Every structure is written in C-alpha cells, then in structure tokens.
Amino acid sequence: GYPNRIKHDCRAIEKFALLFSLRWGSDPFRTDMISNEAGLCWIGFFRGWGSDTQRAKKVAVDLEECSPEGRILDIDIIVCGKSISRSDLGLPARSCILCGRTAKECAREMSHAYSDLRAAVKKLIQNI
C-alpha cells in the first residue's frame, strides 16, 4: 500500500514551493495541491520554462540538495509533456537519504526497511 501522509508535510511543500518561486524569479500563474493515498503533490505552472528548462531543473536540483530537508523533495520539471532529468544536465543521480548510494539503486534492491525511510523523512519534515 501507499504511505500515509506525514504531519506537517503540507507546510514543507509550501515552504519549498515559495523558495522555488523566489529562485526562479516569478510566481506561478496557476497552482494546485493534490493529496491522496500516495502523499502530497504541489503543482506550479510557470511561464518561460520553454526557453530555459535547464535553468529550471538546476533551480529544482539546488533546492533538493541545498539543505537536509530538501533531500525529501522530488521536483520534476516538465515542459510539453517531457520531464527534464538530472542526467539530461550531466548532474549526478539523487542519493539515498539513509546511506548515500543512488536512491534508484536502493529502491530497486529494497535496501532499507520502509520504517527506516519513513522515520528519516519524518525527522526531516519536523525540522522545517
């Protein structure tokens, strides 16, 4: 099953949405917040990405990496239905919040107990 929401997750999302807007240099012209069994998702629609998708992804990765709390984020930049990846920019893959290996590798191998991952995420959210 899906994980349950974590207390204060909305506050964390709102903080990083604001930080993204500030670093991008403009506010989104439309936003939405989706909450379901899988968790919480903030969607922001910004103008001007078509011409500067690499900069948008670099802003996103910087937020994901700039603080321990940012490690819980997964910011996707999608333009015309195409997701811009870290590898598209020659950036390293996201690291695991528990051991530092690549997150995809740990997920694929199920290297960590769900309870350990959830506890780490909870701790990071509580620091926001």
Go through each PLM region and give its residues.
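General detector of N-terminal leader/presequence modules that precede the first folded domain
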Residues: 1-28
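A generic structural motif
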Residues: 1-3, 48-52, 102-105
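Short amphipathic alpha-helical segments
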Residues: 8-16, 55, 113, 117
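Hydrophobic, Leu/Ile/Phe/Ala-enriched alpha-helical segments that form helix-helix packing faces
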Residues: 16-24, 63-67, 125
